[in-house]
From Swiss-Prot:
Localization per Swiss-Prot or TrEMBL: Cell inner membrane
Topological relation to the membrane, as annotated: Peripheral membrane protein
Keywords from the named record: ATP synthesis, Cell inner membrane, Cell membrane, CF(1), Hydrogen ion transport, Ion transport, Membrane, Transport
SUPFAM superfamilies: Epsilon subunit of F1F0-ATP synthase N-terminal domain
GO molecular function: ATP binding; proton-transporting ATP synthase activity, rotational mechanism
Family: Belongs to the ATPase epsilon chain family.
CDD domains: F1-ATPase_delta
Superkingdom classification of source: Bacteria
InterPro entries to which the protein is assigned, alphabetical: ATP_synth_F1_dsu/esu, ATP_synth_F1_dsu/esu_N, ATPsynth_dsu/esu_N
Quaternary context: F-type ATPases have 2 components, CF(1) - the catalytic core - and CF(0) - the membrane proton channel. CF(1) has five subunits: alpha(3), beta(3), gamma(1), delta(1), epsilon(1). CF(0) has three main subunits: a, b and c.
HAMAP family found in the cross-reference section: ATP_synth_epsil_bac
Protein name, UniProt field: ATP synthase epsilon chain
Length: 128
């Protein structure tokens, strides 16, 4: 028995797969989902979405967003979903350095910098 995982970005549906298990990178930790899980809605963090499919494991970096689980369907709404194999460690390191150099003298700048650093760190972890 499997569950369906659908990942949607503003541009298109990035993924629509049957999986035995889905691990979601929630903002406060990882959440595992299998068939029969109780319905829920939650906020995603920056991290790796993992699926265990019949053909093997799949991993995607997701750029925050929201997840909904209902009736053995996992719906993920995110800004970006990138297969981990396509991430470049050097580029992720550069992005993190740029985020750390952002100004943070006002509350608005600090909030923007914090989000950029969290995003870059998540992408760097995923690229390893």
């Amino acid at each position: 028995m499997s569950i369906r995982c659908v990942v949607v970005t503003p541009e298109r549906t990035e993924l629509d797969r049957e999986a035995d298990f889905v691990a979601l990178p929630m903002f406060d930790g990882e959440l595992g989902v299998q068939r029969g899980r109780a319905p829920m809605i939650g906020r995603l963090g920056y991290g790796v979405l993992r699926l265990q499919t019949v053909s093997g494991p799949e991993r995607y970096f997701v750029d925050g967003g929201f997840a909904q689980v209902e009736d053995d369907v996992v719906n993920v709404l995110t800004g970006r979903a990138i297969p981990v194999d396509l991430l470049d460690n050097d580029e992720a390191t550069k992005t993190l350095a740029e985020a750390l150099d952002m100004p943070s003298s006002t509350p608005e700048q600090a909030q923007i910098k914090d989000a950029a650093v969290r995003r870059a760190r998540g992408q760097l972890r995923a690229s390893r």
